[in-house]
Amino acid sequence: MATVSMRDMLKAGVHFGHQTRYWNPKMKPFIFGARNKVHIINLENTVPMFNDALAELGKIASRKGKILFVGTKRAASEAVKDSANNCDQFFVNHRWLGGMLTNWKTVRQSIKRLKDLEIQSQDGTFDKLTKKEALMRTRELDKLEKSLGGIKDMGGLPDALFVIDADHEHIAIKEANNLGIPVFAVVDTNSDPDGVDFIIPGNDDAIRAINLYLGAVATAVREGRSQDLAVQAEEGLVEAE
């Protein structure tokens, strides 16, 4: 089972919060103290809370659940995409479009347009267009791929959100709350933990910390999915490799 130790977290700087003047008092239970006007997060809370989150995400994956990774700020963007791809899940790593979950019907139409344009770009349709029209469609394809590429094969709403930076992604969290989709999120000392079902108190800016969270979640999801395949193999539903 995927787990992360206190040593791993210390090495990655998970315990460094934000400057004390930017704190959210709701995070007080998770703060150990302050050093040089920077809040220090109590890892004695974070370690078990993160490992509980990993276990739950693994369970969701073992039931064929779809997990949407969300991290649109620059520090997290590439790692979010890589980790989601690494465990065959889904991601939003650029701008969160308002209504991405709550207005899924419209989003589905945009995904259909994206897939149509992908086919056109590959089957020679673009070559038959005027230069201007081909350029316009290429730009439209790039724009749609950037915003929806990570969810184009999701085929419906996700079963859980894993979020890097609850403060930055508050719109995504609100939408998930409205739909009853469980939210797992890294919550720093400047963020509001309300609306997060599985709080992971920790640094949400350091690349090493972000990579630690994402790597562990991807491992937990892969393990969960392999459990599902093992069960199916036992029941004769799939051939064991």
UniProtKB/Swiss-Prot annotation:
PROSITE patterns (alphabetical): RIBOSOMAL_S2_1, RIBOSOMAL_S2_2
Entry keywords, A to Z: Ribonucleoprotein, Ribosomal protein
Tagged with keyword Ribosomal protein: yes
Pfam families recorded: Ribosomal_S2 (PF00318)
GO molecular function annotation: structural constituent of ribosome
One GO cellular component term noted in the UniProt record for this chain: cytosolic small ribosomal subunit
Record's keyword annotation contains Ribosomal protein: yes
GO biological process per UniProt: translation
InterPro entries linked to this entry: Ribosomal_uS2, Ribosomal_uS2_bac/mit/plastid, Ribosomal_uS2_CS, Ribosomal_uS2_flav_dom_sf
CDD domains: RPS2
Family the entry assigns: Belongs to the universal ribosomal protein uS2 family.
Protein name (record): Small ribosomal subunit protein uS2
